[in-house]
Amino acid sequence: MRFLIPEGSRVLELGCGSGRLLAEVKPTLGVGVDFSPAMIETARRNHPQLTFVQCDVESPEEMANVEGQFDYIVLSDTIGSLEDCQVTFENLHRFCTTETRIIVAYYDQLWGPLLRLAEITGRKMPTEQQNWLETGDIVNLLELADFEIVKRDWRQLIPRAWLGLGSLVNRYIAPFPGIRRLCLRNYVVARSLKALDHRELSVSVVIPARNEKGNIEPAVNRLPKFGSHQEIIFVEGHSQDGTLDEMRRVQSLYPELDIKVMVQDGKGKGDAVRKGFDTAGGEVLMILDADLTMPPEDLPKFYEAIASGKAEFVNGSRLVYPMEEGAMRFLNHIANETFSLLFTWLLNQRFTDTLCGTKVLLKSDYQKISANRRYFGDFDPFGDFDLIFGAAKLNLKVAEVPIRYASRTYGETQISRFRHGWLLLRMVLFAFRKLKALD
């Protein structure tokens, strides 16, 4: 749960018990609700920095005593004792913003007999008759209540202390496909559809470029107008073909456009993207590769996905439509397919093309990714996975926009297939350790 909820969040827990879990996630605003007066008294005594309310979470009248909106709403094992899960979910919308995440955690139905045996033998606290819901049941109830599933996860294959191997098995074996469906704990993360609305947003298009002189003016000419304001940011990467001079020429040639030109301080696309994003003034941040193999004409689709609220992180995909001949080398294509399967599993959201350069998100979400970058560290020279992993850590809703990948018309690829392939393999292992092999 501490992985899903960043420290300093506003958290509402329904069925908080003694308040232990709520205190562990270290919220700036923590509100716990429970129907048991004894539990509420214990929680208030143990965690005076948090707020606890004694009421029935299924009663709208009693829940009126809880005010405000929250970043996370947690139901940990609570759905097992609810009379009507769907109605309870429906009553949560008033606590939700567009950024709120509902987290439902529960024991898997498969473990029911063993848990009852543990109660009989005194190894687990007895509970009343439970709703033994499968993950699919929880997903269905949330969708009926107008919530959209962001991702699902499964944890804890065996008790931690079992023969001293519990932690090892749970970290390094339990997350694998097939095995994970046998885990004790299910997690479903969802967001409110009722909180979504279409907004007109300003846009910053960041174009990192190294030795792309012939693509600078076409990038400006081919970029459609969309958003309440459009800013174009060229970030030059120490080129040797006059790219920087061409950027300045184009900036002077189109004074009616908001064009900015800067030179990156370090090396690599990731460094260039971070410099551009940190400078950007738009509410929506976009990456457009200067080779223009991703058609600039497709960017309004990415914008619409963000502005409509349908997605919070939009990734391009070159692997859906047929490509132009020579647009992608065979080995690159195989690598993309392989890494896409791996990252779909690692991130619990669908990714068909992690290496597509075009990625779009709100600046407010990017700032959260940047603030939490210490969790992953400075590991990614590409910049793609810094954003993808950060979005996964924030539980952002991901969508992919298929694009028709075109051949280069100027310059040569900046990608060294084998060196970058080795780095990508290292990132898979890194992601497994940071996203799957959790304590």
Feature map (PLM): residue ranges:
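Conserved beta-strand signature within the Rossmann-like core of class I S-adenosyl-L-methionine
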Residues: 99-106
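Short aromatic/hydrophobic "clamp" motif used to bind/position activated sugar donors
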Residues: 285
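Conserved donor nucleotide-binding strand/loop of the catalytic core
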Residues: 53, 244-279
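A conserved acidic beta->alpha catalytic loop
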Residues: 236-245
